[in-house]
């Protein structure tokens, strides 16, 4: 728990889930002046069967009532659409696979929400993320959560120092089973509620059907690297590198995997076998760099995650210019995907990272 003696007025982002519920209950129990905010960030189809916003808001209000705190419902839908969703569609249109949760944290939860909370007189905000923060010589460090299965520092790497200074993560030192147990002890209605796995704030819905509402689709061939047609795709944007399920390619032999997208020919390049060489990468180039500390890390040796929950991969960081860097891995990495984030670590410290643009394999072909 990372608070300071004069941090008494805390506004908690209450999502209607168990993690934020326990966050608020713990802070209230510890004597802080706590208020809640439920963020409504999606309105396009919030009455359909897949959107949980209404139920989530009811759950957040019920939690606030049991804990004994006030709660505001604040609408950031316009900001979400402009800052997060537009980027989400742009990246899919370009053949990449974005991570909206990363941008949602940087632009909505730790910008719009933070600005709102400060305007309401809060000393700091709290969220239910599984991450930790330490202050050393006045510098705020973002650290991995102790529960390695739930660590969410990967999604927080774009937080700037001023955002970290105003944020706390009370669950960072807890494991998920303990959080569930505390929720039951606090008699919270979210104690047994399942974790959300959908797109940030949009919910769990059939992805293909959802994306088709916003982007045109164009069927094309699935081909091998040698040019042999083995199937048909329903639109390049619906596939990601390393994907195995949903390809619909029959026949004998090992399973098929997506290895690349040829945007010029509208072809999906597929290979057989998890260990096919085209699925492995020794280096990547990332841009749109963002770091959590006042000074960017020096070029040198670190570890990196190129997707959530992967094991840290030793690598060397080399800057190409102020906005671009190259990572060279000690060992080949599987299915490194443009549009996803490459996040750097020094031990448990999350240093920041960038958006993967290219790798040493031609995975997004545009000419």
From Swiss-Prot:
One of its GO terms (biological process) is tRNA wobble position uridine thiolation. Its main location: cytoplasm. The record marks 129, 340 as: Interaction with tRNA. Disulfide bonds join 104-200. Coiled coil: none annotated. Keywords: ATP-binding, Cytoplasm, Disulfide bond, Nucleotide-binding, RNA-binding, Transferase, tRNA processing, tRNA-binding. Belongs to the MnmA/TRMU family. This is tRNA-specific 2-thiouridylase MnmA. It comes from Neisseria meningitidis serogroup C (strain 053442). The gene is mnmA.
